[in-house]
């Protein structure tokens, strides 16, 4: 089976006409959830994904509201709650220089410019102006590393290694 990547989690239905409420896990919701695009639904207790074609997409508060072709009522989409939406690897688009997909960053080892290994990136937070990487060290403690030019000095995706410069107070 072709490699697939998460683009959203279905958290609830919305209204009565078959809309679902999605928390996007992609930096490109407008692109991923474009009308006519295909996504794959992985339901909690199902082994096989369901192919869905997006019929409509709109933003509502902090959610993306989606409707799929062939689904016209709440009773048809209630089962989708807690499902995960994915796309195939072939659907990924090329990024600009120094832009990376989350799956490329998660799992990378973080080292300082002095050569000290801090741990592995386990999660990426998106609180606002810049992403924040959660790095778990061998001591099981989490360190938060902002993805900014003053801190992140080199990203080597092939070697899964990221070099950072530790600013004063960053690891305290």
Swiss-Prot record:
Single annotated GO MF: ribosome binding
Subunit structure and binding partners: Binds ribosomal protein uS19.
Coiled-coil region: none
UniProt GO BP: ribosomal small subunit biogenesis; rRNA processing
Similarity-based family: Belongs to the RimM family.
GO cellular component entries: cytoplasm; ribosome
Protein task: An accessory protein needed during the final step in the assembly of 30S ribosomal subunit, possibly for assembly of the head region. Essential for efficient processing of 16S rRNA. May be needed both before and after RbfA during the maturation of 16S rRNA. It has affinity for free ribosomal 30S subunits but not for 70S ribosomes.
Subcellular location field: Cytoplasm
Source organism superkingdom: Bacteria
HAMAP family: Ribosome_mat_RimM
Tagged with keyword Manganese: no
Domain PRC barrel: 96-170
Keyword field: Chaperone, Cytoplasm, Ribosome biogenesis, rRNA processing
Record's comment describing the protein's domains: The PRC barrel domain binds ribosomal protein uS19.
Biological source species: Listeria monocytogenes serotype 4a (strain HCC23)
Membrane-crossing segments per the record: none
The name this protein goes by in its record: Ribosome maturation factor RimM
